[in-house]
């Protein structure tokens, strides 16, 4: 039966305020771990007299400087993100390495109880540190950050998501949380980290600390910052998996809502810089200068085999793997959705409960990771092992754990390890007989559920690596079941399993395929990987949405998809426009402007000319709240309602109208005017966008949505069908296209008639 519980249905956000009132003009969302107000970004260039004069005044040197700085910033993004990614991996591998070495040494000495205490207490301290600094210093750093970055690139802005404080806590918190053996990843936080680096570089410094760079003034707008953030997100993926092309495709397929060839070149340049820098740094680690776990983290999971081949008989198990990945992926998304909702009710009780939950998850995880290997039987070391067996303390396939000399614990090799090294063990070639069925199955179940319960804690945590390790475990299990009936070795099945689970949860095909190919250095798997990704995505799409879209909905982000809902074609623009509409005259009294700004939260106001400037009321343009505040602070008032002269424009600089960064924005309460000034007038004509986008009120809502999203605008003016009415009948914003708003205005619209086909199973209902 059809099911409308996915992205086609009305979002049921986590916020109680959003659940109670869906038609509120002010919007909030969960950013990281806290509820924050959100605003829309404006990618439209305001074509007013002041902008035209400023653009004409730019010299050829300034234009060259602008183009050159674009490429220089992309280079800087690549350098900084690669250094952060390397430091992140180095810190995690060594922190976790010290913990595992100390614990293993105690177990070798027979002090199992003390080993557990050291292991669990270390994990608890690291988790407590990560959750405390995140909850109290930078709540926006919680989670992976990918939903926030994806929403930003769609046009949704939130405070502090790209601030310096968020960047620092994201790095330190993720290092601490991953080192605590929580089943979380580094890739998602690296995407957010790259976006933070890009945004900070594009801000041109900080006025608060008197550190500003005038040569970056041209980038203080939403359009250029959007491009830089896209470069940063791609660089983050490239730094996580050493996959430069995969990073480009990830930004294209999953993150960016607007794309063009010029941006593609700059993103490719950034990821290429990341790859080169990481290669140089990794060469240093190969010489043993990076501490305990220098060969983990960013080193390739090399499963290349010259004699790897497959036949027609291998296609059927690969198809089965894709179907299983789609079903398990949709189940994973469903359960994660429910867990995040449950966590939110706990978080509503206060910060203390957030930290207590993180500590509880840490203790539970430590008990499982330490205790489960005792269920596995010891295996004799293979005589032809290519590495030391058993491996004591360090990474490897052969963990000694509680086993006698000459034996190893295969489950400990997977579960009592870092996530990166667990993936290396699962992907490793020529290891078809080193893991037992029971151990791989236990590891899969543990990863599947632990990653679900670990993601929602108040700490920087990603999903990419847990999904890979979970998929790799059941992929290897399928390969073990097939045994000699398949020409593919178990390591290749693990890679295909990881691909199928990524396709089932994240629904990315092209970028996932390239990332895994770059990660494993095995191009021979390309056809099989393409098939398994297509099947897993197709199967999973029959049940629910991809994981990041689900999380964005839960957080309350008003994300605009590239397609319009079918029921929108049955509604006109005029059906969703709500009032009252606030309009300014071209020459307006200052007192009126201040009153409107104080009594409304609107960020855009139509400017209308009437007699004596025009025979009948006519639309002149649109002016933004931020620009009005700049005019009020400058106090360019006139004693009578007359147009300003050219000298007025010369009093302003383009930087004064530039978009501020992550700092505190201007507010009307900060503007103090005398009674004399309130009775004066302000000419809005030179500063209004004289060519705003407009639609007639009889246009279908679906068509207006496509225009709104593709152009990337913040305000869409609605004009009347007939001429005997006011020149503007309303303004469409992002909020007006949200399903909960539309169906709140028109509850009689039958959604079931227009919903997409979904499969309903009793478990998913």
From Swiss-Prot:
Question: Where in the numbering of this chain does the CBS domain appear?
Answer: 568-640, 687-748
* Keyword annotations from UniProtKB, A to Z: CBS domain, Chloride, Chloride channel, Ion channel, Ion transport, Membrane, Phosphoprotein, Repeat, Transmembrane, Transmembrane helix, Transport, Voltage-gated channel
Please give the superkingdom of this protein's source: Eukaryota
Q: What cellular-component terms does GO give this entry?
A: chloride channel complex
The cross-references to PANTHER family, in alphabetical order and at most eight, read: CHLORIDE CHANNEL PROTEIN CLC FAMILY MEMBER, CHLORIDE CHANNEL-LIKE PROTEIN CLC-G-RELATED
Q: What does this protein do?
A: Putative voltage-gated chloride channel.
Q: Tell me what this protein is called.
A: Putative chloride channel-like protein CLC-g
Source organism per entry reads Arabidopsis thaliana (Mouse-ear cress)
């Amino acid at each position: 039966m059809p099911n409308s519980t996915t992205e086609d249905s009305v979002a049921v956000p986590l916020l109680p305020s959003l659940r109670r009132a869906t038609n509120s003009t002010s919007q909030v969302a969960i950013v990281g771990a806290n509820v924050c107000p959100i605003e829309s970004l404006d990618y439209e260039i305001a074509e007013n007299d002041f902008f035209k004069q400023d653009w004409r005044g730019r010299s050829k040197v300034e234009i060259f400087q602008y183009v050159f700085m674009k490429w220089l910033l992309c280079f800087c993004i690549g350098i900084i993100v690669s250094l952060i990614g390397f430091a992140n991996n180095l810190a995690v591998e060594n922190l976790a390495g010290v913990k595992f070495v100390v614990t293993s040494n105690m177990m070798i000495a027979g002090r199992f109880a003390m080993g557990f205490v050291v292991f669990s207490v270390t994990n608890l301290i690291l988790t407590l540190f990560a959750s405390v600094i995140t909850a109290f210093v930078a709540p926006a750093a919680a989670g992976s950050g990918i939903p926030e970055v994806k929403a930003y690139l769609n046009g949704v802005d939130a405070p502090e998501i790209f601030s310096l404080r968020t960047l620092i806590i994201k790095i330190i918190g993720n290092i601490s949380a991953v080192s605590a053996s929580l089943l979380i990843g580094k890739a998602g936080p690296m995407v957010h980290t790259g976006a933070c680096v890009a945004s900070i570089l594009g801000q041109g410094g900080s006025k608060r600390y008197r550190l500003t760079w005038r040569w970056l003034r041209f980038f203080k707008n939403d359009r250029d910052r959007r491009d830089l953030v896209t470069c940063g997100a791609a660089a983050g993926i490239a730094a996580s998996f050493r996959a430069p092309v995969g990073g480009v495709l990830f930004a294209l397929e999953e993150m960016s809502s607007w794309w063009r060839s010029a941006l593609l070149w700059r993103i490719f340049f950034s990821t290429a810089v990341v790859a080169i820098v990481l290669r140089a740094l990794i060469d240093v680690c190969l010489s043993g200068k990076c501490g305990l776990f220098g060969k983990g983290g960013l080193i390739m999971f090399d499963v290349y085999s010259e004699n790897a081949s497959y036949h027609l008989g291998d296609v059927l198990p690969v198809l089965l793997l894709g179907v299983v990945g789609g079903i398990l992926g949709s189940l994973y998304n469903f359960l994660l959705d429910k867990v995040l909702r449950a966590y939110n009710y706990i978080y509503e009780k206060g910060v203390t409960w957030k930290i207590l939950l993180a500590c509880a998850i840490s203790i539970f995880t430590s008990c499982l990771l330490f205790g489960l290997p005792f269920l596995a039987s010891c295996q004799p070391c293979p005589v032809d092992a290519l590495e030391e067996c058993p491996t004591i303390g360090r990474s490897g396939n052969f963990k000694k754990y509680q086993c006698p000399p000459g034996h190893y614990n295969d489950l400990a090799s997977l579960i009592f390890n870092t996530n990166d090294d667990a993936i290396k063990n699962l992907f490793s070639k020529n290891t078809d007989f080193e893991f037992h069925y029971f151990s791989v199955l236990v590891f899969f179940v543990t990863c599947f559920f632990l990653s679900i319960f670990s993601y929602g804690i108040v700490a920087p945590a990603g999903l990419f690596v847990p999904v890979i390790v979970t998929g790799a475990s059941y992929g290897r299990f399928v390969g073990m079941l097939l045994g000699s009936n398949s020409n593919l070795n178990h390591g290749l099945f693990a890679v295909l399993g990881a691909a199928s689970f990524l396709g089932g949860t994240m629904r990315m095909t092209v970028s996932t395929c390239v990332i895994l190919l770059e990660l494993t250095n095995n191009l021979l798997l390309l056809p099989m990987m393409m098939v398994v990704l297509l099947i897993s995505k197709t199967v999973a799409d029959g049940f629910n949405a991809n994981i990041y879209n689900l999380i964005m909905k839960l957080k309350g982000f008003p994300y605009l998809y590239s397609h319009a809902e079918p029921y929108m074609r049955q509604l006109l623009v005029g059906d969703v426009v709500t009032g009252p509409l606030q309009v300014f005259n071209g020459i307006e009294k200052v007192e009126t402007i201040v009153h409107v700004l104080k009594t409304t939260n609107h960020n855009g106001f139509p400017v209308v000319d009437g007699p004596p400037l025009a025979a009948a009321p006519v639309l002149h343009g649109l002016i933004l709240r931020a620009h009005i505040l700049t005019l009020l602070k400058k106090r360019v008032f006139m004693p009578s309602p007359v147009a300003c002269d050219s000298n007025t424009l010369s009093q302003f600089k383009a930087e004064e109208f530039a978009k501020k960064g992550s700092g505190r924005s201007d507010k009307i309460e900060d503007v103090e005017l005398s009674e004399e000034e309130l009775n004066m007038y302000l000419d809005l004509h030179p500063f209004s966008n004289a060519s705003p986008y407009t639609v007639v009120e009889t246009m279908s809502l679906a068509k207006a949505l496509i225009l709104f999203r593709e152009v990337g605008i913040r305000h869409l003016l609605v004009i009347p069908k007939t001429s005997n009415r006011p020149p503007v009948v309303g303004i469409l914003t992002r909020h007006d296209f949200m399903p909960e708003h539309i169906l709140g205005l028109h509850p009689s619209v039958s959604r079931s008639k227009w919903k997409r086909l979904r499969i309903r199973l009793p478990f998913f209902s």
